Amino acid sequence: MKNCTLGNETDNSLISNAFGFLRFPLNFQPYSSDADWVITGVPFDMATSGRAGTRHGPGAIRQISTNLAWEGHRWPWHFDMRERLKVVDCGDLVFNFGDAQDMSDKLQAHTEKLLAAGKRCLTFGGDHFVTLPLLRAHAKHFGKMALVHFDAHTDTYANGSKFDHGTMFYHAPNEGLIDPQHSVQIGIRTEHDTNNGFTVLDAAQVNDRGVDDLVAQIKEIVGSLPVYLTFDIDCLDPAFAPGTGTPVVGGLTTDKALKMLRALQPLNIVGMDLVEVSPAYDQSDITALAGATIALDMLYLQAAKK
């Protein structure tokens, strides 16, 4: 239907714009809203190299988030984020199906418009390629940033196509969007280049080291730069997140990931995304629930500063 989607565009998708995260009402005029943070879904998986299906991720995250909406003074924060932070869900980005360039251009423009209006952005993928246009928009507004990146893969591979969910963090430093010397990749457990400047905290050491020790190192690496936080759900072990396109065994537990995430509160996080939830491969919605919980704790990170 027309006039009931982001940008007042006709959306013929069967999987977009169903309901808001955490039962937030959908707001299709986010630029003029009084929101502090705006949630946008990007149902895109054309850049996937393995199993597709992450286009259904935003819907799955929103649907399972209703299980989290009832809790007021949420554990372990002991306050209600909704009383401190104004959050709206503006639904899903509308773009031409089958046109990756159109998605990229529209996501960047949408994000730039939100940032110019004084909003901050939490984005649900979709595959991880969506982070690149998000970084382009944020870098225009904040300048070069530090990247805090949870993933099983570094996504710094130089041999991919223009639209590839494994190449974003090869292109981003080359475009001057992020500073690898002040960026950290967490949970990595696949082959990667060790000479590109990123600090890699591989899954083995993350699983063996304590949270306080790890977070102290992350804070030291990031320094005072504005931070973009991106969480690929395959950072988690497949026992906790089977519903993703490129699962890799030996990953983080949800407990370890959440404890690390919650400890990042002092960082100057200016943008966030949660990507690669693919519900077709999920079991009992545990991947979507992990994603929704991580996204909610991302918002609590911001509310805790109020």
From Swiss-Prot:
A Pfam family this chain is assigned to: Arginase
Pathway(s) this gene product operates in, as recorded in its UniProt entry: Amine and polyamine biosynthesis; putrescine biosynthesis via agmatine pathway; putrescine from agmatine: step 1/1
Catalytic activity, EC: 3.5.3.11
Cofactor requirement: Mn(2+)
Cystine bridges: none
Gene disruption: observed consequences: Cells show a delay in differentiation to swarmer cells and are unable to migrate effectively on agar surfaces. Putrescine restores normal cell differentiation and migration ability.
GO molecular function: agmatinase activity; manganese ion binding
Catalytic activity: agmatine + H2O = urea + putrescine
Protein name: Agmatinase
Species: Proteus mirabilis
Top-level taxonomy: Bacteria, Pseudomonadati, Pseudomonadota, Gammaproteobacteria, Enterobacterales
